[in-house]
Amino acid sequence: MSIDINWEAATSGPDGEKLAERIRSFIHDKFQQIALPRFIRSVEVNSFDFGTVSPELQVRDICDPFNDFYEEDEDGEDLSESSVSDEPAPSSQGLSQSTPNGDAGSSNSSSNGDGGGNTNSRVGYFQRRYPSGEYAGDFPQPLMSPINLGESFNPYLFPRAGTPGIPGGTSNLGYYNMPRGGLSGTQTPLASVASVARGGPLSLAEGWPPPARQRERARSSDADVDSPQSRSRPSTSSTRQRTSTDGGTPHDSAEIPESESVITGHLDSALPTRRMREQKPDDFQVLCRLQYSGNMRLSITAQILLDYPMPSFVGLPLKLNITGFTFDGVAVVAYIRKRIHVCFLSPEDADTLLGADDKMASTEGYHDHHNHHHSGNTNTTGSRRSNDSLLREIRVESEIGRKESGKQVLKNVGKVEKFVLEQVRRIFEEEFVYPSFWTFLV
């Protein structure tokens, strides 16, 4: 079943301009968090344009939502049923960032970023989740301004929906990101539960067992304690459990080495407790194939440093017009009690869940006759590889400095073009491809 989208009505007018500006601001903020190479001083995202070509949507399956969408926040800030009621919320927007121990820091602003206070918008937040306590390192800086897409969508995007953009009402954005842990092939969380794809709610994170089972396995595992995968995969060692006859604990502490007890205690304190929402019969999830090949455009300006006659002698502006986006992937849209969860599946996970589809094979690389640098995959087999990207092709048109006699002063900008294209692809895959997913309150 295909879905028709009135692309012009959805992306034009004041609402379309606001949405385009918020997307531009979001991508710009992500570029500010990237470590730039030595030959680039700065990167600025100037504009974003939806273009005139609409994507194609085809519903592939309707099933129960993934179990991951039922998980509540560890820090207790998850909105309850009463908090997502129809009562208007304060106009200020909050921004919070959780820590591995569940602590959160927040900062509030008195306006919604565009100068006008929206008294009907709910609090938007940015959050990262780290399953099984595998987090190590510093958190990235939070976004400068949370994106409230609910104000920008309009009913033309999904004509049959009763609300702007998605069913329900004014929506606001929450972001969840869960690292993949380097799994691929049959080790991916989705592949491990593909056998029960039609038997009930799925969890793309079933590769991590519940904390209770992990604690039991940690006590009985002697070989996998120091392995990075020991916290995320089941232990293969046997479980030895003694039954106490004098009313004591089932385990004899004398038989547990002191070093193992210390490690076990560390694992117990590091593993978060997954609190799940109650599943209801009216919860549902839609898997749809999304194809796009149009004239969407992203304009970026990069400052290139010249090292002659001395290091960092001068900076030249390089204008990059990124266009030629070609996208083909499977989108997941789950509706769970006034929440819309949206993400994309990696090509490998999509083939595991829906089966390999010859129609979804990668298209051949675009043959550009204007010497434009482009990025595309050339895999033409029916089953896509795990390293295939959902963004099949991206092209960039570069313009540096001033022009003389219709020719550019400098043309050797291949390194900058390659870097920018790689970052655009990485931002998309890290922010929209599972295990990352976006939550809209409706």
From Swiss-Prot:
SMP-LTD domain span: 1-442
GO cellular component: endoplasmic reticulum membrane; ERMES complex
GO biological process, one term: mitochondrial genome maintenance
Listed Polar residues bias regions: 90-100
CDD domains per UniProt: SMP_Mdm12
Pfam family, one: MMM1
Disulfide bonds, paired cysteine numbers: none
Its membrane topology: Peripheral membrane protein
Family of the protein in this entry: Belongs to the MDM12 family.
PANTHER family associated with the record: MITOCHONDRIAL DISTRIBUTION AND MORPHOLOGY PROTEIN 12 (PTHR28204:SF1)
Self-association and partners: Component of the ER-mitochondria encounter structure (ERMES) or MDM complex, composed of MMM1, MDM10, MDM12 and MDM34. A MMM1 homodimer associates with one molecule of MDM12 on each side in a pairwise head-to-tail manner, and the SMP-LTD domains of MMM1 and MDM12 generate a continuous hydrophobic tunnel for phospholipid trafficking.
Name the UniProt record assigns to this protein: Mitochondrial distribution and morphology protein 12
Organism, scientific name: Arthroderma otae (strain ATCC MYA-4605 / CBS 113480) (Microsporum canis)
Native organism taxonomy: Eukaryota, Fungi, Dikarya, Ascomycota, Pezizomycotina
